[in-house]
């Protein structure tokens, strides 16, 4: 199995970051644009490229769709849209993550599972969301805008639980742009309602899931930006080569608490 060599940089590091928990900030205190302005950019992009459903070997999920904010110029499937690269693949078996195996992949480098391969921001994305993306201090890797079309859905008692990459490798910033009271995040035996106007960061190496607390009666989709940052790495944008940055090894909890992820 061929992996991205960037993984070697993290050998011997603390990938659990167990002191890193749940954090929330207002967009204003982070110096970020308003949710309304970000949503305007998202809608402009949607009008130009459309939305792409989550795809696996066994099914296509139309109720969960969106578009990628980053892409891999060397992606293994040349026919797949650059905007759908982070929306699964017909080679993967499971709904989330790599914890249950690689599916039909013969290599992980330059596949859906290659987090560090998603090193480029498309011109259309930059045109309409550059004012937002440029406000972050770290390189942007695997990132997406995610829509959940949950109207009529009932709560799922046990589905959707997953873990993501270690936060020292990919630190996710979750920003709700459009939501309603039915939608929540469950993490560490707690339930959180994410509010428009805030940004959330939590330890995604711990099991968590998006879900509903009751039948969804809101017809408009839930829309979140899920931005993945590389807090310990610098990126050469021309060559897509990563190197350790000056914060390499600094606890993620301190990076977030000190707001070092924004300019």
Language model feature labels by segment:
Residues 104-121, 167-174, 249-261:
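Short N-terminal helix-initiation segments at or just after the protein's N-terminus
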Residues 179-263:
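Catalytic core of Fe(II)/2-oxoglutarate
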Residues 23-25, 143, 173, 208, ...:
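A broad, low-specificity signal marking well-ordered, structured residues that form hydrophobic/aromatic
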Residues 1-135:
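Non-heme Fe(II)/2-oxoglutarate
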């Amino acid at each position: 199995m061929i992996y991205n060599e960037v993984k070697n940089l993290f050998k011997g590091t603390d990938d659990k970051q167990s002191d890193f928990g749940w954090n929330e900030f207002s967009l204003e205190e982070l110096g970020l644009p308003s949710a309304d302005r970000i949503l305007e950019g998202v809608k402009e992009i949607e009008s130009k490229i459309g939305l792409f459903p989550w795809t696996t070997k066994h099914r296509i999920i139309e109720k969960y769709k969106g578009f990628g904010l980053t892409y891999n110029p060397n992606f293994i499937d040349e026919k797949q849209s650059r905007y759908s690269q982070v929306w699964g693949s017909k080679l993967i078996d499971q709904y989330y993550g790599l914890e249950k195996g690689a599916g039909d992949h013969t290599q992980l480098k330059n596949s859906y599972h290659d987090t560090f391969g998603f090193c480029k921001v498309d011109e259309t994305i930059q045109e309409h969301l550059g004012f937002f993306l440029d406000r972050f201090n770290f390189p942007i890797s695997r990132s997406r805008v995610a829509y959940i079309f949950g109207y009529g859905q009932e709560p799922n008692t046990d589905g959707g639980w997953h873990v993501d990459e270690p936060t020292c490798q990919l630190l996710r910033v979750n920003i709700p742009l459009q939501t309603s009271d039915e939608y929540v995040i469950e993490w560490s035996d707690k339930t959180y309602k994410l509010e428009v106007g805030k940004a959330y960061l939590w330890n995604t190496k711990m099991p968590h899931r998006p879900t509903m607390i009751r039948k969804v009666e809101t017809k408009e989709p839930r829309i979140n930006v899920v931005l993945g940052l590389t807090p310990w790495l610098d990126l050469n944008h021309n060559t897509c080569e990563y190197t350790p940055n000056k914060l390499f090894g600094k606890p993620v909890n301190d990076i977030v608490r000190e707001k070092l992820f924004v300019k």
